[in-house]
């Protein structure tokens, strides 16, 4: 196999005309130059140099190799510099997938802090709810997935690096003027006869489970993945809802009141990545900034 260090020596010999001059240029000994040239000729399978008097002359094969060496070595140098920039966080790219309420609350502060600390790092953002976002991570379509789960699902993320960020409590949402709008806390069973407005499929399943545990099945009249739409429907008096605190934080409820719901239901917000990706400097830095944003 032809090695880059051998090409550098060959180019120096071709430029200077002798092993001794090449050794001086490269800062090594003449025997070292001779040894590397022998190794290069063995790899090439043909002579690359011939001695003419006191000078070394390139053979046809040597001329061909030197002709390509400059481009090869320049490309290798550029690659080394680019990799060093990525390793040193002077450059890098991170593909982030987040659920909508995470995009509007956690992500902006995290990315602003990342840009301030490492302006050469570029982050792209697309939105997807779990489990789709987790599938994208496993399929190689993103580097970090901001996701959530209710309770603990055994083995769900065992193949991933899980960075816990925060616990997000579900909050009740009722129209202004509702009989429970001024209550300090509301038992979920007190809303058994209400029309319900449900959120994303995973949140919807959790709503049904919580209600059924309290002895009733919610009558879901409207369902939408768009949390501002849920809040708008509640504000219009079309029903009640239970939403994550992050979702309500990102939109000012108009015509609706938030109430504490008992029993408490929480979801775990996490950042997920693959074990190998967790060692990539730009990914690790982004995970750190997401964790910091979650504590603000």
Predicted regions and their residues:
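Short helix-boundary/capping micro-motifs
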Residues: 12-29
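Conserved amphipathic alpha-helical core elements
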Residues: 22, 40-41
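A short LG(V/I)-centered, amphipathic sequence patch enriched
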Residues: 41-60
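Interdomain hinge and pocket-entrance segments immediately C-terminal to HTH DNA-binding domains
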Residues: 54, 60, 84-103, 117-122, ...
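Central regulatory/effector-binding core of bacterial HTH transcription factors
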Residues: 91-154, 224
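A late-sequence structural motif
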Residues: 106, 256-296
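Hydrophobic hinge/microswitch elements
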Residues: 129-142, 148, 201-257
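Secondary-structure junction motif
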Residues: 148, 180, 193-214, 279-288
